[in-house]
């Protein structure tokens, strides 16, 4: 599963959340596999009149949809999950999260009439998920919201 091809490189692609508060979303790409961590929104600046919320530009994911394997969500704050109902309209792949985080996500999906349209998998701490060439482990961490996780990613790329 985690076999390395010559000249292959792990790409880390921030799609939001840099130099700003909110809109956390990062893609990890290796060969023909892409996994995405978090899918948050941000709130508009004062000069953005008429705008209620800001979602990340996921054009890259839409253009590579056949390679996107899933979303891994670290915790239930809006800046990490708020864009899920909007993004999954175009990039509908499975979501992996801990129990409380998934409960919050399911509430959002229900509000948008999407609950039955999205595959979801509740993950326990210490559990490994294998998707494409990636292996992801959920690790318990402390945060200002319960059931947060840090993620350990393993790919064929050298460390």
Where are these regions (language model features)?
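Divalent metal-coordination and catalytic microenvironments
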Residues: 12, 38, 75-76, 143
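N-terminal Rossmann-fold NAD(P) dinucleotide-binding loop
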Residues: 80
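Metallo-beta-lactamase
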Residues: 100-148
């Amino acid at each position: 599963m985690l076999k390395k091809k010559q000249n292959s490189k792990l790409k880390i692609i921030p799609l939001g959340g840099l130099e700003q508060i909110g809109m956390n979303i990062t893609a990890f790409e290796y060969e023909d596999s892409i996994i995405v961590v978090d899918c948050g929104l941000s709130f508009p600046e004062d000069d953005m009149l008429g705008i209620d919320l800001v979602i990340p530009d996921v054009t890259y994911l839409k253009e590579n949809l056949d390679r996107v394997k899933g979303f891994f969500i670290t915790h239930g704050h809006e800046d990490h999950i708020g864009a899920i109902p909007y993004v999954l309209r175009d990039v509908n792949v499975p979501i992996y999260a801990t129990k409380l985080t998934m409960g919050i996500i399911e509430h959002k999906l229900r509000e948008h009439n999407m609950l039955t349209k999205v595959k979801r998998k509740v993950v326990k701490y210490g559990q490994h998920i294998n998707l494409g060439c990636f292996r992801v482990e959920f690790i318990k961490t402390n945060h200002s919201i319960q059931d947060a996780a840090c993620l350990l990613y393993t790919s064929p790329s050298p460390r």
